[in-house]
Amino acid sequence: MSLNRNEKEAVVAQVSAQVAKAQTLALAEYRGLTVEHLNALRKQAREKGVYLHVLKNTLARRAVAGTSFEVAAGSMAGPLIYGFSEDAVAAAKVIADFAKGNDKLVIKAGAYAGKALDAEGVKALASIPSKEVLLSQLLGLMQSPVSRIARVLAALAEQRGGSAEAAPAEAAAA
């Protein structure tokens, strides 16, 4: 079923709105996927905040024209599903994780920070931990020296025969 001009303009406007908010674009060929598999992929994408859309490639090229994702326009050929995400790694991660379990979904290309990515680049981007994981790792690194100092002070207080609360006061007096 073909779309008339107004419907095409509406689709391009809708996708352009998602593109404007996105940091990452991931393209994958879905040839041979069943409807059930596509629905499962869409469900996973919704849970991760990824906008997935099957588009005509010409409409996708129009939607990304003038954006940082225009560099991926050369890769837009064949039956593709487009994944856009505000999180830097979410789109790549959702598509790569699904492709691991289903050989019919083939990662083709992507774009991040104005640079075109090949399939290996998208897989590398997908292997980066999410922002939340990176922040928790950073917090753990920052808390590690503080907790070590607290343990040393507690051990020092035990050696001197005092309480753990007295150790910081003694250390400050010294």
UniProtKB/Swiss-Prot annotation:
Q: Which CDD domains match?
A: Ribosomal_L10
* Superkingdom as given in the UniProt entry: Bacteria
The keyword Translocase belongs to this UniProt entry's keyword annotation:
no
**Listed GO molecular functions?**
large ribosomal subunit rRNA binding
Query: GO BP, one example?
Result: translation
Q: Does the keyword Ribonucleoprotein apply?
A: yes
**Sequence intervals crossing the membrane:** none
The entry's keywords: Ribonucleoprotein, Ribosomal protein, RNA-binding, rRNA-binding
Listed under GO cellular component are: ribonucleoprotein complex; ribosome
Classification via InterPro entries: Ribosomal_uL10 (IPR001790), Ribosomal_uL10-like_sf (IPR043141), Ribosomal_uL10_bac (IPR022973), Ribosomal_uL10_bac_type (IPR047865)
Q: Which SUPFAM superfamilies match?
A: Ribosomal protein L10-like
Q: How does it assemble?
A: Part of the ribosomal stalk of the 50S ribosomal subunit. The N-terminus interacts with L11 and the large rRNA to form the base of the stalk. The C-terminus forms an elongated spine to which L12 dimers bind in a sequential fashion forming a multimeric L10(L12)X complex.
General function of this protein: Forms part of the ribosomal stalk, playing a central role in the interaction of the ribosome with GTP-bound translation factors.
NCBIfam families per the UniProt record, alphabetical = PRK00099.1-1
What family is reported?
Belongs to the universal ribosomal protein uL10 family.
Protein name per the record:
Large ribosomal subunit protein uL10
Q: Which organism is it from?
A: Methylibium petroleiphilum (strain ATCC BAA-1232 / LMG 22953 / PM1)
